[in-house]
Amino acid sequence: LVARLIHDSSERRDKPFVTVNIAALPETLMESELFGHVKGAFTGADQSREGRFAEGDGGSLFIDEVGDIPLGIQVKLLRALQFGQIQRVGENATRTLDVRIIAATNRDLRKLMEQGGFRSDLYWRLNVIPIAIPPLRERREDIAALTRWFIEKFSKEYGRPVRGISREALSALMRHPFPGNVRELENAVERAVLMTRREILSTQDIQLERSEERRVGKECRSRW
């Protein structure tokens, strides 16, 4: 959300905003996902493909969980940051791009760097304007606003008629510790919007990580 806000508040707002979650990628496909590949570069590469860097040319690329990038690929990421150049897998030529990088991680990159798991030159290249965001459990005042924003987002995305959440359902969210941080809240709201038959989400619609097999609370007719 912060990355999107940075992009939307900048001169690049009308250009692409591309995201990639490193933690969700197998290491074997990570380089191709970031930088692209040419046809025949590896088994299964039946056609050439642009990577996330090329997709974000002129705009912003948000790299989530950047601390999970292996050392070998960190070298290529550093070159992209330093010189604005990338090289697709299986291609000798380099391409020059204009992409602003916004990176996030839940790991201590300085400690990882000291342990040899993260390049120091890449660390300092990324650490230009650090922004520390407390976990959701430490800023519960944001839960209501985020919940409404996610409801609006997913209602539009999936064409669902959901337009709000009951007070009791919101209270259940406010009490939850959210070990999965904002992503856990987003997933819970997305699932609720998809599965409900109501216009107002109730406690019966909200399922949280520690209680996947039962509903949260009891139905309440009060509305937020």
What are these regions (language model features)?
Residues P16-V18, Q47-G58, F62, P70-K76, ...:
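AAA+/SF3 P-loop NTPase mechanochemical coupling elements
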